[in-house]
Amino acid sequence: MSGRRPTLLVFCDSLSYYGPRGGLPADDPRIWPNIVASQLDWDVELIGRVGWTSRDVWWAATQDPRAWAALPRAGAVIFATGGMDSLPSPLPTALRELIRYIRPPWLRRRVRDLYGWLQPRLSPVSRNALPPHLTAEYLEMTRGAIDFNRPGIPVVAALPSVHIADSYGRAHHGREATARAITEWARQHGVVLVDLKAAVADQVLNGRGNPDGIHWNFEAHQAVAELMLKALAEAGVPCR
């Protein structure tokens, strides 16, 4: 990293780059990764997509050339996922993600509409999108692979956020099990955690976030950034 600014390597779901009105470019200064990087005087490599779970982070870390390029100059790595892992999913993730590939288009639209109708009705009795033990397993696989290539690099992870989304029937009964699994994994491997619920609950649960009931406003992004900076300092990153 000599002669170059360190990079904050962030693996995330859409919570990290959505604001109160929708998705934002990765360089928007109001989202928490850029607030954190600005305070550190670092660059950011933001790798994520809507709906990503910890399994997707594993795939990204091992298959995305942006991650390969960023890791040698990374000053720290953040796993900002877990929210989608803990959300209820009436269909197994593999089947749900196949909807986009259905042909012809008219049939795809009908299937998507049907799923959109079923999801809020079945979510209260559905299992997590990713079983908690798999969340922990994929996080450790990713952490281990990163540590193999960059021994001792500071790693921070997150506990799931909260939501009041009607699209999920406002159900989030899987959060606690996912949070426990992540907490135990972090304890075993010395990973510092940020509790996203603690940062954003006041904004989200009181209806001050995105109207979808899942994503955040910029006050929540600022609160997350503050907790991330504290966690990075605890993990050994010198903060200004």
Curated annotation (Swiss-Prot):
Keyword terms of this UniProt record: Acyltransferase, Transferase
Pfam families in alphabetical order: Lipase_GDSL_2 (PF13472)
GO MF annotation list: diglucosylglycerate octanoyltransferase activity
Enzyme class of the recorded protein, top EC level: transferase
Influence of pH: Optimum pH is 7.0-8.5.
BP GO annotations: protein tetramerization
Reactions this protein catalyses: (2R)-2-O-[alpha-D-glucopyranosyl-(1->6)-alpha-D-glucopyranosyl]-glycerate + octanoyl-CoA = (2R)-2-O-[6-O-octanoyl-alpha-D-glucopyranosyl-(1->6)-alpha-D-glucopyranosyl]-glycerate + CoA
Temperature and activity: Optimum temperature is 45 degrees Celsius. Activity sharply decreases above this temperature.
EC numbers: 2.3.1.273
NCBIfam families membership: DigluglyOctase
Family (UniProt): Belongs to the OctT acyltransferase family.
Record function comment: Sugar octanoyltransferase likely involved in the biosynthesis of mycobacterial methylglucose lipopolysaccharide (MGLP). Catalyzes the transfer of an octanoyl group from octanoyl-CoA to the C6 OH of the second glucose in diglucosylglycerate (DGG). Can also use hexanoyl-CoA as acyl donor in vitro. DGG is the preferred acceptor, but to a lesser extent, GG (glucosylglycerate) can be used as substrate. DGG and GG are the two earliest intermediates in MGLP biosynthesis.
Self-association and partners: Homotetramer.
The protein, known as: Diglucosylglycerate octanoyltransferase
Protein source organism: Mycolicibacterium hassiacum (strain DSM 44199 / CIP 105218 / JCM 12690 / 3849) (Mycobacterium hassiacum)
Name of the gene encoding the protein in the UniProt record: octT
